[in-house]
Each structure stands twice: as structure tokens, then as C-alpha cells.
């Protein structure tokens, strides 16, 4: 009869179908959860390059993608993916970027202090900006700042125009940023003695 186990210990077709349905449901749940997690982040593809490798039978082509992922609230990461197809390279880059997440200290939508980042031949200078200034940055530095959630900043590239160098220089500069509380504790002073009055007013308005 349908749904009953056979005497030899095997299962009927109905039982196997139910088991497969349960497995398929779990896979769908995991897939939906991963899609929800990805939808929470901002992804920007900075550059896609086609690279070739010379082998015995000829040339073997693949693609590389430089991807930036952030939540728009201070978390950002950069990843570099390589695959035989462009979508796979972008996906690998996004996964690596999420593994490289770091937090950017900000006050009222801008960075806490001037900083200069360097990576290879790339040099990027960043300065805090007043509210309403916007993201004054071009090239590959802009998507990094936008994914991090920086709203007002003055940024200028002083070195190489290579997108990979500019992105890594921007990330290096953002990683040098310190919160005002950390600077005050390191110097053994109060927050009012270290932070400028403009930053203190911005923090007070943000907390209010």
C-alpha cells in the first residue's frame, strides 16, 4: 500500500518523495537566507579584467573582478575574485570582501581626522568635510567611501591612477582612522581637550 514500508526494509516511493521534499525545503531556506544577507549590503564592481595564461595547448582565459561591499553604516570590505566567467569572478570577489570587513570611524557622516593612505604606487589624501559637502572623490576611491556610508568628505588621488592601487590606498587610509576616545585615552587627556569643537558639536547633535 502507498506510504507503507516494505518487508525488506526499503521505503516506498511516497516516503522517498517526502524525504526529498524536506531536503529541497532546507536548501531553499538556506538559499533564501543567503540572498537576504546579500541584499543588506551595497556591492560595487570597480573593475573587471580579462587575463590569459599560456599553456601547452594555447591560451587559457579567465576574468578578475575587484568588488567593494559595505553596509552603508560604517562597515566596508574589498575583495578580488578570479574565475572563468565574469559572474563567478564577481561572486568570489564579493565573498572575499565580506570576509575583509572593517569598521570606519565616523562622526556626523564624515571621517574623524585627515589621513593619507598609501598602497604600492597609489596615494589617496582624505579630509573631513562639513555637512552638505557630499562625497568629493573620483575614480575608484568614490565607491569605497559610498559603500562605507561616508556622506561628506574631501578626497584626492595623488599617485597612480590604477584602480586597484587607488582602492587599496583608500582602504589603507580608512584603516588608519581613530575614534576621538581612543586618541584621548592614548594621550591621557579628556575628549574635550583632544577633539575639535566642531566635532564635539556634531557628536552632541547626533546623540540628540
From Swiss-Prot:
Stored InterPro entries: Ribosomal_Su5_D2-typ_SF, Ribosomal_uS5, Ribosomal_uS5_bac-type, Ribosomal_uS5_C, Ribosomal_uS5_N, Ribosomal_uS5_N_CS, Ribsml_uS5_D2-typ_fold_subgr
GO cellular component, one term: small ribosomal subunit
PROSITE patterns, A to Z: RIBOSOMAL_S5, S5_DSRBD
Stretches assigned to coiled coil: none
Domain of life: Bacteria
Region annotation (Disordered) ranges: 1-38
Any single GO BP term: translation
Location of the S5 DRBM domain: 41-104
Alphabetic keyword roster: Ribonucleoprotein, Ribosomal protein, RNA-binding, rRNA-binding
Keyword rRNA-binding part of the UniProt annotation: yes
GO molecular function: rRNA binding; structural constituent of ribosome
Subunit-structure text: Part of the 30S ribosomal subunit. Contacts proteins S4 and S8.
Function according to Swiss-Prot or TrEMBL: With S4 and S12 plays an important role in translational accuracy.
Domains as described in the record: The N-terminal domain interacts with the head of the 30S subunit; the C-terminal domain interacts with the body and contacts protein S4. The interaction surface between S4 and S5 is involved in control of translational fidelity.
Family the entry assigns: Belongs to the universal ribosomal protein uS5 family.
Name of the molecule in the record: Small ribosomal subunit protein uS5
Taxonomic lineage from the root: Bacteria, Bacillati, Actinomycetota, Actinomycetes, Mycobacteriales
Gene transcribed to yield this protein: rpsE
Amino acid at each position: 500500500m502507498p506510504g507503507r514500508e516494505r518487508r525488506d526494509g526499503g521505503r516506498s516511493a511516497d516516503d522517498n518523495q517526502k524525504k526529498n521534499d524536506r531536503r529541497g525545503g532546507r536548501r531553499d531556506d538556506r538559499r533564501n537566507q543567503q540572498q537576504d544577507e546579500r541584499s543588506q549590503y551595497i556591492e560595487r564592481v570597480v573593475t573587471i579584467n580579462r587575463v590569459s595564461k599560456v599553456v601547452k595547448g594555447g591560451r587559457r582565459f579567465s576574468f578578475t573582478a575587484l568588488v567593494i561591499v559595505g553596509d552603508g553604516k560604517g562597515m566596508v570590505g574589498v575583495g578580488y575574485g578570479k574565475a572563468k566567467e565574469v559572474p563567478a569572478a564577481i561572486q568570489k570577489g564579493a565573498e572575499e570582501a565580506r570576509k575583509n570587513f572593517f569598521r570606519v570611524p565616523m562622526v556626523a557622516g564624515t571621517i574623524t581626522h585627515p589621513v593619507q593612505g598609501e598602497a604600492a604606487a597609489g596615494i589617496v589624501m582624505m579630509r573631513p568635510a562639513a555637512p552638505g559637502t557630499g562625497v568629493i572623490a573620483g575614480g575608484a576611491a568614490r565607491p569605497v567611501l559610498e559603500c562605507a556610508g561616508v556622506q561628506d568628505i574631501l578626497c584626492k588621488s595623488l599617485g597612480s591612477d590604477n584602480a586597484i592601487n587607488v582602492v587599496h590606498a583608500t582602504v589603507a587610509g580608512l584603516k588608519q582612522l581613530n575614534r576621538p576616545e581612543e586618541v584621548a585615552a592614548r594621550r591621557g587627556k579628556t575628549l574635550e581637550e583632544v577633539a575639535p569643537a566642531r566635532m564635539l558639536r556634531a557628536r552632541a547633535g547626533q546623540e540628540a
